[in-house]
Amino acid sequence: MRMTMEEMKNEAETTSMVSMPLYAVMYPVFNELERVNLSAAQTLRAAFIKAEKENPGLTQDIIMKILEKKSVDVNFTESLLRMAADDVEEYMIERPEPEFQDLNEKARALKQILSKIPDEINDRVRFLQTIKDIASAIKELLDTVNNVFKKYQYQNRRALEHQKKEFVKYSKSFSDTLKTYFKDGKAINVFISANRLIHQTNLILQTFKTVA
């Protein structure tokens, strides 16, 4: 049975999403290791990237096994969200033009606000303010994306438009998750949705970096 284009896109999204722990958890570890042993860190980083590409989700499985063996009781989804605000060099746009650097800044701002959700969610007043800040940050990021579209022409504009639509879709999904949260109080679903939105934010940067 052949998959439809939409199913293929969904599968690709799921595949890349499970690889999130590679850059959110392991990249900072590699960066620290580089200070001690640059060669070993680079070798280990390359090995993890290759293994993750061939077996999406492998990094997450390894981390979970280590936590299990050490009997560490941790909410992995929540922890991932807390760590996901850091810049990922592979996604940062290197072009020096102000519009592209602004895109980096707006993406960073959104990810940082989203990563604070676990600290804010139990304080209703602060969390409501955080939600407003997230909405503003989403709008600012989309405005910046549109500014880049206006100023620069791309051969692969379709890929950029698609990624923008995906980002909007996950932004709306995040909004719907928040509405449900205020009814059922299940914070874990908010964390999952926030992680997905951070992932989409990184994919916007990655797409622009690839075609720019």
Swiss-Prot record:
Membrane topology (UniProt): Peripheral membrane protein
Localisation per UniProt entry: Cytoplasm; Golgi apparatus membrane; Cell membrane
Record's keyword terms, sorted: Angiogenesis, Apoptosis, Cell membrane, Cytoplasm, Golgi apparatus, Membrane
Stored InterPro entries: PDC10_dimerisation_sf, PDCD10, PDCD10_N
Keyword S-adenosyl-L-methionine: no
Family annotation (Gene3D superfamilies): 1.10.12.70, Nucleotidyltransferases domain 2 (1.20.120.330)
One GO CC term, this protein: plasma membrane
One MF annotation (Gene Ontology) recorded for this entry: protein kinase binding
Family of the protein in this entry: Belongs to the PDCD10 family.
Name the record gives this protein: Programmed cell death protein 10
Organism: Gallus gallus (Chicken)
